[in-house]
UniProtKB/Swiss-Prot annotation:
GO MF assignments: transaldolase activity
Pathway(s) it belongs to: Carbohydrate degradation; pentose phosphate pathway; D-glyceraldehyde 3-phosphate and beta-D-fructose 6-phosphate from D-ribose 5-phosphate and D-xylulose 5-phosphate (non-oxidative stage): step 2/3
Reactions it catalyzes: D-sedoheptulose 7-phosphate + D-glyceraldehyde 3-phosphate = D-erythrose 4-phosphate + beta-D-fructose 6-phosphate
Primary subcellular site in the record, as a coarse category: cytoplasm
InterPro entries linked to this entry: Aldolase_TIM (IPR013785), TAL/FSA (IPR001585), Transaldolase_1 (IPR004730), Transaldolase_AS (IPR018225)
Catalytic residues as annotated in Swiss-Prot or TrEMBL: 132
Subunit structure: Homodimer.
Name of the protein this chain belongs to: Transaldolase
PROSITE patterns from the UniProt entry: TRANSALDOLASE_1, TRANSALDOLASE_2
Length: 321
């Protein structure tokens, strides 16, 4: 029998949500996604010990504000993780713009361009990289500009149709609507358990996928943030799914039949609309789940970025001693 992972690969582009080099080499995804949490975890492994030494040595040679230096070294390390992943996948690696820039379009643009330049310095073309931005109004506006410059973007922390509509308006390359974090919110709010078919996160991604296909929107839908293999199976056929290694392993061991749940041919009419800033902000205001999970996600990524910068500061201090 064919594993569910292999069956999934026939209808969906499988992406690994990890910086674990060994897992990527073993599971052979098409793309990889990273975030500050994943980068921090990867840097804790022996594989990146030399990269840390190199980045710290580079940082020692830089002048200026210590906070700016530690931030630059942290960026360099994130690029090191991304560059290692690029060697292992045929497709793209997503690298995230600092979460603390989520409400600053111009600063997000500057950071995104510097990420692309840093990859180019390592001989990696921009068509191998996706710039990952939070799906705030400001992040979406930054993505709109970057797309016009030929820099493809992955809009993350997406919890609502309002965000998906705004991303479509901006003609972004790819969105990452979250599944598991939506489920978390509803389970906490209602005290209920949900089957995969009832899962509010699954329903949200299906609605967004249908809206895009019904209106011939080219933006790729990549479901993200899974709590179970059941959620993944419920979205089989989605353009892409980014999945953690433990769930990829679970699917690889399961030789049951996988049923396709999503296809462009199955789309239902859903009239195309556009959102301006005030409409977007009002729709988000009316969606408590999306508002809370977006804010929570930004805080969590900012916290892990802060942890990475603190680690870098300590390494720089030790190197200077």
């Amino acid at each position: 029998m064919t594993s569910k992972l292999d069956q999934l690969r026939e209808i969906t582009t499988v992406v690994a949500d990890t910086g674990d080099i060994e897992a990527v080499a073993r599971l052979k995804p098409v793309d990889c996604t990273t975030n500050p949490s994943i980068v921090l975890k990867a840097l804790g492994t022996p594989m990146f010990a030399d990269a840390i030494k190199e980045a710290v040595a580079w940082g020692k040679k830089q002048g200026g504000n210590p906070d700016a230096v530690s931030s630059a070294v942290a960026d360099r390390l994130a690029i090191s993780v991304g560059a290692a992943l690029v060697k292992l996948v045929p497709g793209r690696v997503s690298t995230e713009v600092d979460a603390d820039l989520s409400f600053d379009t111009e600063a997000s643009l500057a950071k995104a361009r510097s990420i692309i330049a840093a990859y180019k310095d390592r001989g990696i073309d921009q068509d191998r990289i996706l710039i990952k931005l939070a799906s705030t109004w400001e992040g979406i506006r930054a993505a709109e500009v970057l797309q016009k410059e030929g820099i493809d973007c992955n809009l993350t922390l997406l919890f609502s149709k309002a965000q998906a509509i705004a991303c479509a308006d901006a003609k972004v390359f790819l969105i990452s609507p979250f599944v598991g974090r939506i489920l978390d919110w509803y389970k906490k709010s209602t005290g209920k358990d949900y089957t995969a078919e009832e899962d509010p996160g699954v329903i949200s991604v299906r609605e967004i996928y249908n809206y895009y296909k019904a209106n011939d929107i080219k933006t790729i839908v990549m479901g993200a943030s899974f709590r179970s293999a059941g959620e993944i199976e419920a979205l089989a056929g989605c353009d892409r799914l980014t999945i953690s290694p433990n769930l990829l392993d679970e699917l690889a061991k399961d030789e049951g039949k996988l049923e396709r749940k999503l296809s462009p041919e199955g789309r239902k009419p859903d009239p195309k609309v556009s959102v301006d800033e005030k409409t977007f902000r009002w729709m988000m205001n009316e969606d408590a789940m999306a508002t809370e999970k977006l804010a929570e996600g930004i805080r969590a990524f900012a916290k892990d970025l802060g942890t990475l910068r603190t680690m870098v500061q300590k390494e720089l201090q030790l190197a200077a001693a």
